[in-house]
C-alpha cells in the first residue's frame, strides 16, 4: 500500500509501510534533488511526486504526470563510456533501462558528474544531464551492431550493461537526435538542495 507525504513546497513523496534499505538512500536523495532542480528551473508550477515505494512501477518520480527514471553515471564522461544496465544477474530479472521500458516509463534521465583530480585532469569536462525518451533510447542501443551488453565488473558482477561511447554525445548524429534536453549542472549546485527530514525517516537505520 502506498502512502503520501506532502511537503510545504507542494512536493509529494510516496512511500510504503516497510522502510527501504539504507543502501538506496543516496540514490533517492539525488532523485529528490534532480526533481527539485527541474521544478525550480524548468516549470515551477509543475507537480513533482517522488516515489520511494518498493515497487516503483512508474519510475523514480513523476513530473506533471510524466514518469522519469533517473540514473547517475559517475565518471562516464572521463572514462569514455556510458553504462546502461538492462539485467540484474543476481536476481535474473530486468533492471535499469529495460525495466523502465517494461514499466512504460516515459523518460530516461541521466546525470554525469565528472571525476576531476588535483592537477586539473578532466577540468575541461562539465557535469552534464541528458534527457531521453525511454523507448527510443532502448531500441537505439539494441539496434547498434557495435554496442554489446557485458558484465559491469569482471569479478562479482551483478548486472549486464550496454556500454555506449561517451563521445557519441557530440560525435554520433543518431545518438544526438535522441537527446531531448541537455543541461550542464554543477554537482555542487544539486548537493546544495536541502533534503527534507521526512525523507530520511523512510529508510532503515544503519
Describe each model-derived feature in a short phrase.
Residues 1-206:
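Nucleic-acid endonuclease domains
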Amino acid at each position: 500500500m502506498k502512502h503520501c507525504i506532502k511537503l510545504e513546497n507542494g512536493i509529494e513523496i510516496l512511500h510504503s509501510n516497510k522502510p527501504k534499505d539504507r543502501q538506496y538512500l543516496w540514490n533517492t536523495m539525488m532523485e529528490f534533488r534532480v526533481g527539485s532542480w527541474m521544478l525550480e528551473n524548468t516549470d515551477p508550477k509543475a507537480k513533482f511526486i517522488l516515489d520511494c515505494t518498493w515497487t516503483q512501477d512508474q519510475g523514480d518520480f513523476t513530473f506533471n504526470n510524466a514518469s522519469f527514471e533517473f540514473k547517475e553515471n559517475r565518471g562516464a564522461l572521463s572514462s569514455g563510456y556510458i553504462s546502461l544496465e538492462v539485467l540484474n544477474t543476481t536476481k535474473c530479472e530486468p533492471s535499469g533501462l529495460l525495466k523502465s521500458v517494461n514499466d512504460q516509463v516515459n523518460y530516461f534521465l541521466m546525470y554525469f558528474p565528472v571525476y576531476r583530480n588535483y592537477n586539473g585532469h578532466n577540468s575541461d569536462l562539465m557535469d552534464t544531464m541528458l534527457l531521453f525518451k525511454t523507448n527510443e533510447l532502448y531500441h537505439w542501443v539494441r539496434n547498434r551492431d557495435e554496442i554489446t551488453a557485458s558484465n559491469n565488473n569482471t569479478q562479482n558482477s551483478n548486472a549486464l550493461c550496454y556500454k555506449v561511447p561517451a563521445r557519441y554525445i557530440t560525435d554520433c548524429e543518431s545518438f544526438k537526435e535522441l537527446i531531448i534536453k541537455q543541461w550542464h549542472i554543477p554537482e555542487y549546485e544539486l548537493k546544495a538542495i536541502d533534503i527534507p527530514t521526512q525523507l530520511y525517516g523512510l529508510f532503515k537505520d544503519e
